[in-house]
């Protein structure tokens, strides 16, 4: 389990995260939701150690990630898979080379083993046959699936996704949501997703943390989102595409 205890983060005089305490459940699809500028990305970057909190603790199974040595943090990050807003693929590498890249860098596997593992991950995201294509030759949705395959190639315990549906059409977004949800269950990964897409929230959200102006306003599951008595959350929900007339 990931526990966040009284996290603050400031940039100069601007306080971006304000006393956030929450938990992210093991083997579940955890969503951090909120409008743009709410602090979602700053919180996620703090969780993975790309930013140091001004104050507070981030605990992985009871171990304080913030106070770990540099060496221990590096080892800890190898248990994390990451998917960014853009697919962040290497244009000069083929699809299978992109997926294999973490193994090439950090594993002791033979080339044949690395290639086989990369192929397994591509098959899992339904990209069999695209191995030798380059990122510029495939669609944005396919690029996101390559990014997912790369993120899970080293069998991470935690999967962090920053706006994985950014720039995608609704149909493709649904495919990505379903893929992340099924991989979470199949591999028993603890998945944390930043999003402001209420379709994702209502589709795959098992543990939902709502952030507004750097503060945690509400936490629950998708079944209780609509019935929430939190006015700020209600405003976000009813302003979304879920309730817009066609």
Question: What residues fall within each predicted segment?
Answer:
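Helix-to-loop junction immediately C-terminal to a conserved catalytic motif
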Residues: 48
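Conserved ABC transporter NBD signature motif
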Residues: 56-64
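Conserved ABC ATPase "signature" region
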Residues: 111-129
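Conserved ABC ATPase signature
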Residues: 134-138, 142
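A short, proline-enriched helix->beta-strand linker immediately N-terminal to the Walker B motif
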Residues: 153-157
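Catalytic Walker B motif of ABC-type/P-loop ATPase nucleotide-binding domains
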Residues: 159-162
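Helix N-cap at the start of a conserved alpha-helix in ABC-type nucleotide-binding domains
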Residues: 170-172
